Every structure is written in structure tokens, then in C-alpha cells.
A protein has these predicted regions:
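Hydrophobic alpha-helical segments within soluble ligand-binding/sensing domains
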Residues: 1, 37-44, 56-75
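Generic hydrophobic, helix-prone segments enriched in Leu/Val/Ile
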Residues: 2, 24, 41, 99-107
């Protein structure tokens, strides 16, 4: 419906490329999205009208998985004030295919940022908040 109104641009928060890419490209309407660095988003930024993508690494859930595994195994990790852990992972932004490719190649199913080796560093009996925070900050 929004595309039928002939907008000059289209802004989406998640999955515009999944549902609207074909229609937006055919109509010549530039669009932006907050989504992941996926193959289809790469095609949209290279050959289509996707002009801005803010995304997270596909493996960004890795540290949360590590925190849960630690808690299950008896190492409940808290911050310095005794609160539940809160970590921030910034969005990566691509406005062209070259930048997109850099992020996509650095984190995909075959080569995740939070690989098994990385997760092994933050899962264990002696892991602390500082350890997990350092690993997340370095990625």
C-alpha cells in the first residue's frame, strides 16, 4: 500500500528487503533498512535501491548464549554492582556495496564473528563480566 502511494523514499525497521525489494526496485524508490548483513541485502545494495543498511552481525547473539551457558553451569555472571549483565553491540552501517561486503565477509554462517573459538573464551567456570565485556568490545 505504501508503495502504491509513490513515495520518494521508503524507510523500514527490519525486513524491507524480504518483503518489498522487488517492488521498490521496480518503482525506482530508494529504501533504507535496519536488518542483517545477508546475501539478499547484499544484492539489494549492489543492484537495487537499498541505499542505507544498519545491521548487526548475524552471530551477535553469541555473548547472550555464553551468559546462559555459564549460568546453567553454575557461573552466574553479574556486573560490578551485582546486576544482570547488559552489553551493547553497535550497529554496523553500509551505504555502498564495498562497505557491505566488508561486514558480510567478516560474519556469515561459514565465518561467524562469535565463532566456537571465541565463545570458548567466554564460557567457563572462571569467566567474569570483564572477560565477556572485553570480547564484545573487541568485536
Amino acid at each position: 500500500a505504501a508503495i502504491q502511494a509513490a513515495p520518494e523514499a521508503f524507510i523500514s525497521v527490519g525486513m524491507a528487503t524480504t518483503f518489498f525489494t522487488q517492488q521498490l526496485n521496480a518503482a525506482g524508490i530508494e529504501f533504507s533498512d535496519i536488518d542483517s548483513f545477508t546475501k539478499s541485502n547484499g544484492e539489494a545494495i549492489t543492484n537495487g535501491k537499498l541505499v542505507y543498511l544498519a545491521g548487526k552481525y548475524s552471530s551477535s547473539v553469541g555473548p547472550a548464549f555464553a551468559l546462559v551457558m555459564n549460568a546453567i553451569n553454575g557461573n552466574v555472571i553479574r556486573d560490578a554492582q551485582g546486576n544482570a549483565v547488559s552489553l551493547s553491540q553497535n550497529y554496523q552501517v553500509a551505504t555502498d556495496s564495498e562497505t557491505f561486503d566488508k561486514f558480510y565477509k567478516n560474519d556469515n554462517g561459514d565465518n561467524p564473528i562469535y565463532s566456537r573459538d571465541t565463545l570458548d573464551q567466554i564460557i567457563g567456570d572462571t569467566v567474569t563480566f570483564d572477560t565477556i565485556n572485553e570480547v564484545v568490545a573487541s568485536n
